[in-house]
């Protein structure tokens, strides 16, 4: 094995250190045997991470994860005041992957490969050194997966979710609801997301696209109101809560503390907040580059044309938030389930992109295009 960071393999404490024990950091660490480094460590914060349900459309890089999914749905809906659109895909069913299950799996694989897992808070880094609350560590190569702060004013996908247990069977366990816009639209682009695990148990999230995060009470009231209005649920048990905020924009790449990967390295799809499949794609490309003897280099998992389309789309919905339900309805109506899954995972070809463009109302997008300078 060779040290990509320096010719003298004994000069550093570790040949490579991964900062951050989240999805990107541990997804890389679990494949340490494919890296051209001898001694590898992961530094992760001491704080216990909140368990999240990750929504995943499968792609070529998610096979190991999809087999661990809590549940998959071959049918899903987009619902607006215009009606409900049901899409289906047996090839790319929508999956719910629990973060705890995946991260535990990655840690186990990493440990089995001899990766050292270190708990600590990183306070500073240089090209080859990392300062933590327990002292300094040196490394030939540093990978940094910690999320950057979301810039003020950027659109954010923010949400609170409750996994609920109903007293009677009210959910359709064979059909997920990815977006239901029949809820309070006064605070931004707001929809309810429902993943039914059984006829009586489901994850229900209140999600908003806007630059402003609301008080918890707003999301929780929206969940209760929705369950009462559309499922007749007034008495429920909350089994679990989750909360999050995801940037909806192209974040500036930060190479100051090592090679950025994951959200820090631009893996989040701006228009959707989808990240898991793109993180796996980014890591696969990074490993292939290293295995071929090339130096580590940041690699975006997105195509430039998709990022360009996302920029225009985000500008349109930010300037016209009330138009958003119509746009998502139109896209769902124009695409098959397979098409939707391909588009969301970045596997679209030009014909599919054209389908999406043709489904959209032209005037708002032309205005956004002219204002963006093309």
Predicted regions: what they are:
Residues 284-374:
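C-terminal helical "tail/cap" subdomain of flavin- and related membrane-associated enzymes
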Residues 19, 143-145, 260-262:
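Redox-cofactor binding/interface segments in oxidoreductases and associated redox assembly factors
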């Amino acid at each position: 094995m060779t040290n990509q960071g320096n010719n003298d393999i004994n000069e550093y404490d570790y040949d490579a250190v991964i900062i951050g024990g989240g999805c990107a950091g541990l997804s890389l660490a679990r494949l340490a045997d494919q890296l051209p480094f001898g001694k590898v460590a992961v530094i992760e914060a001491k704080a216990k991470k909140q368990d999240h349900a990750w929504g995943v459309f499968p792609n070529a890089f998610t096979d190991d994860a999809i087999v661990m999914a809590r549940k998959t749905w071959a049918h899903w809906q987009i619902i607006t005041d215009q009606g409900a659109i049901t899409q289906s895909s047996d090839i790319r069913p929508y999956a719910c992957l629990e973060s705890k299950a995946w991260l535990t799996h990655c840690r186990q694989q990493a440990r089995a490969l001899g990766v050292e897992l270190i708990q600590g808070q990183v306070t500073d880094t240089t090209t080859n050194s990392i300062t933590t609350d327990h002292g300094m560590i040196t490394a030939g190569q540093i990978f940094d997966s910690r999320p950057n702060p979301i810039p003020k004013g950027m659109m954010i996908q923010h949400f609170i979710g409750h996994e609920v247990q109903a007293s009677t069977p009210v959910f359709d366990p064979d059909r997920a609801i990815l977006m239901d816009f029949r809820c309070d639209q006064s605070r931004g682009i707001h929809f309810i997301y429902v993943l039914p695990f059984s006829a009586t148990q489901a994850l229900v999230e209140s999600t908003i696209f806007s630059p402003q995060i609301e008080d918890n009470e707003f999301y929780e009231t929206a969940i209760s109101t929705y369950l009462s209005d559309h499922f007749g649920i007034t008495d429920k048990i909350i089994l679990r809560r989750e909360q999050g905020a995801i940037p909806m924009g192209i974040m500036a790449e930060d190479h100051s503390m090592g090679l950025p990967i994951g959200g820090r390295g631009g893996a989040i799809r701006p228009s959707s907040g989808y990240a898991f499949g793109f993180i796996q794609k980014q890591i696969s490309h990074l490993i292939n580059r290293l295995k071929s003897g090339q130096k580590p280099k940041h690699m975006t998992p997105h195509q430039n044309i998709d990022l360009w389309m996302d920029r225009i789309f985000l500008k349109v919905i930010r300037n016209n938030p009330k138009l958003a339900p119509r746009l998502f309805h139109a896209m769902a109506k124009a695409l098959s389930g397979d098409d939707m899954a391909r588009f969301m995972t970045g596997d679209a070809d030009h014909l599919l992109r054209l389908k999406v463009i043709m489904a959209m109302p032209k005037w708002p997008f032309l205005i956004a295009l002219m204002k963006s300078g093309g």
